[in-house]
């Protein structure tokens, strides 16, 4: 089977790290051991610097919504061109913690940036490049935020209002409903059931890939 790009998406506290472990276990059970892990924003020296700016901001300066989204796409194109595409070209599988869907949901939905601008940014920066599979971990924002707060200090985005995350979730669900490559997982279940749901969805997808 050719190398694939699998992305894990979701709000804060959705359990992306646990989901990644489940994805890796399923892939390795299928004999897929050459796996590259990525996270967004980040993954290259420049992208990591941009991540710090996006997450923490700069004292005394307001980070505008458009500046935020432009930095996210700058970080993304660095990661895609320098890490993800080369990994796929040499036959590695790539498992990503977030990708473009995050920007479409957080900045397009949460921030309310015009959908045409968001689509234009995606198409200009990424062209036709898309993940082969996205696992979207869905849960009520209040639940996810409670989990995030329990982990400790919140970053700039995690400190946004509940209404912001409600809008973000709504956009996630809207986009997932219109794209067959996005599989929605109920992340409000107990962790064992979430892992089982991910395993089932991924195993079925892998079977379908072998049949193509």
Curated annotation (Swiss-Prot):
One Gene Ontology CC term in the entry: cytosol
Keywords per UniProt: ATP-binding, Kinase, Nucleotide biosynthesis, Nucleotide-binding, Transferase
Cytoplasm recorded as keyword: no
Cysteine disulfide partners in this protein: none
Biological-process GO terms, alphabetical: dTDP biosynthetic process; dTTP biosynthetic process; dUDP biosynthetic process
Catalytic activity: dTMP + ATP = dTDP + ADP
HAMAP family: Thymidylate_kinase
Family named by the database record: Belongs to the thymidylate kinase family.
Record protein name field: Thymidylate kinase
Protein source organism: Yersinia pseudotuberculosis serotype O:1b (strain IP 31758)
Gene from which this protein is expressed: tmk
